[in-house]
A protein has these predicted regions:
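Nucleotide-activated chemistry modules centered on ATP-dependent adenylation/adenylyltransferase
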Residues: 1-227
Length: 227
């Protein structure tokens, strides 16, 4: 079956990096939970990292606890650097991201990108596993299984890059994988609470931006396009 092929690929990729890999999971999309479920079948001891921006909805925190209880993974919670966050808020306010795309990118950079880059360097990770898929958005259409040019000295592995959403949700149902409760309210993608609303794909993310603006925070893609 195709799913078993994906699981074998994930297993061999993880082994090829001497288990020095980390799964990056937002707990705001079902893809990350699918990969956690797959990893749990082959590794008793693996790490999941997630970024707590300070603006996440309660449903996301609830899922983190449910997933931790079911799969028993090691959880690393990454937080923004206090001084940078404080400076931005004092200069531009709590919700500066609504004012412009530039402010949105600045907020995402401080709350997500910089803390994540620091985490990878400090932990000397050789590979980051993500739940990116090609059909999630126009920005992600060129996503590949293995990508090498985003993170310094660290590969990015996208084991379900060629899956459809229907296949993801089929796996969730068949394997009883816990997912964010906001998906039942029409959110296909959940990020920070003030930056997410119900929508297909990533349409509900940063909805106030122009339609041609990349709906990306910068974690996986540089501003203006994919890898």
């Amino acid at each position: 079956m195709e799913r078993s092929i994906t699981e074998k690929t994930l297993y061999h990729v993880a082994k090829s990096y001497d288990n020095r890999f980390v799964l990056s999971c937002s707990f705001g999309a079902p893809e990350g939970m699918v990969i956690i479920d797959m990893l749990s079948k082959h590794f008793k001891d693996f790490s999941v990292c997630t970024i707590d921006t300070g603006r996440l909805p309660q449903a996301t925190y609830n899922l983190i606890d449910r997933a931790k209880e079911k799969y028993k993974f090691n959880l690393d919670v990454i937080y923004p650097e206090f001084d940078l966050l404080q400076k931005m808020i004092n200069e531009k306010g709590m919700n500066s991201f609504y004012a412009s795309e530039e402010n949105q990118q600045e907020c995402c950079n401080i709350r997500k990108v910089l803390p994540f880059d620091k985490y990878l360097k400090e932990n000397k990770a050789k590979a980051v596993i993500t739940g990116l898929r090609k059909d999630q958005s126009e920005t992600r259409k060129d996503t590949k299984l293995i990508e090498l040019d985003k993170y310094e000295n660290c590969a990015k592995i996208n084991p379900i890059y060629d899956w459809t959403r229907e296949r993801v949700m089929g796996y969730v149902e068949h394997h009883n994988v816990p997912i964010n409760s906001l998906h039942q309210e029409g959110y296909e993608s959940v990020g920070c609470a003030p930056c997410s609303r119900p929508g297909i794909g990533r349409d509900g993310r940063w909805w106030w931006l122009n339609d041609d603006a990349p709906k990306e925070c910068g974690l996986h893609f540089d501003k203006g396009g994919g890898i």
